[in-house]
């Protein structure tokens, strides 16, 4: 929708408080649209409860976990742990966005609705992992305690526009990660569960993406700078997970989430929707940010080409060894 600017003067006048107020109507419209298309679903319906067995501890018939019990592939197990631990930090994410967006009006209603929907993801993933014995339950809990005990601080907590820009890309990145994890898991039950979660993440992305588009109509220079900063410095919210760098490298090789996927399936779709390189009428700082964004995307694509070549060479070596 087109927003009438309140003509507050220079970009410096656009404080977070004024932007929140100016975008309130957009948030309300997007919230109403979201509620019409979002479908409620029951996490327990996606869990293979009949596969469950007691673990050792308080039950005499408890059976210790063993890697061979899992139907999930190795890369699927790695990605599932990273994805679940990322979802587990929901209390910190809620605190971040509630503090920034507020708890009143349409903003507050969205914050609480988003939190409630996201809460399903951690519930169903943990139930699936434990019931199907896909992961070591003791290590999973140790990872959860370690990760959540560190807390979470968003890189973009200083700015409402940066935060909106970040979640527009991050929600899509999370959707893609869940979807690809399902494809690589080797278990149709897991794939179906993660497809359901990915549907939620996509709707969340659409909400923030549309909000970001509206922000461009109000404060194009500031929004362009925010998008530039977020894209150039992007990192997933689970970056603080113990062993994240090694897991991320394995997920890249396993084609769950890597540089090519990040460029083609996450950054480009949002930037194309915003027609980011076609926006004109920008001031000097906005133009500079737009140019730097274009240069960064070109550089990222070139790096992705190198990654693709290395990955193809690795696959060829592995195929040769398998055929030997």
Could you tell me what each predicted segment is?
Residues 2-324:
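Non-heme di-metal
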């Amino acid at each position: 929708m087109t927003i009438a600017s309140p003509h507050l003067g220079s970009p410096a006048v656009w404080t977070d408080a004024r932007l929140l107020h100016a975008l309130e109507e957009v948030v309300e419209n997007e919230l109403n649209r979201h509620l019409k298309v979002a479908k409620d679903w029951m996490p327990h319906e996606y869990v293979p409860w009949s596969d469950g067995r007691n673990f050792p501890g308080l039950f005499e018939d408890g059976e210790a976990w063993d890697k061979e019990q899992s139907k999930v592939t190795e890369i699927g197990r790695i990605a599932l742990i990273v994805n679940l631990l990322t979802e587990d930090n929901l209390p910190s994410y809620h605190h971040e966005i509630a503090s920034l967006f507020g708890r009143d009006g349409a903003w507050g209603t969205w914050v609480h609705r988003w939190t409630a929907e996201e809460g399903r993801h951690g519930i169903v993933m943990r139930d699936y992992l434990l019931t199907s014995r896909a992961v070591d339950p003791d290590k999973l809990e140790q990872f959860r305690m370690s990760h959540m005990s560190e807390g979470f601080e968003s890189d973009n907590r200083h700015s409402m526009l940066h935060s909106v820009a970040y979640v527009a890309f991050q929600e899509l990145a999370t959707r893609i990660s869940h979807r690809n994890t399902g494809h690589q898991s080797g278990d149709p039950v897991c794939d179906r569960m993660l497809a359901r979660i990915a549907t939620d993440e996509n709707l969340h992305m659409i909400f923030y993406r549309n909000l970001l588009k509206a922000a461009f109509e109000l404060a194009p220079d500031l929004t362009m700078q925010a998008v530039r900063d977020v894209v150039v410095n992007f990192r997933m919210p689970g970056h603080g997970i113990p062993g994240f760098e090694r897991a991320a490298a394995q997920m890249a090789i396993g084609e769950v989430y890597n540089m090519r996927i990040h460029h083609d399936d996450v950054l480009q779709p949002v930037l194309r929707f915003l027609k980011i390189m076609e926006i004109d009428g920008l001031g000097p700082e906005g133009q500079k940010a737009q140019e730097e964004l274009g240069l960064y995307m070109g550089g990222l694509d070139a790096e992705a080409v190198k990654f693709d070549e290395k990955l193809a060479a690795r696959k060829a070596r592995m195929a040769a060894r398998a055929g030997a």
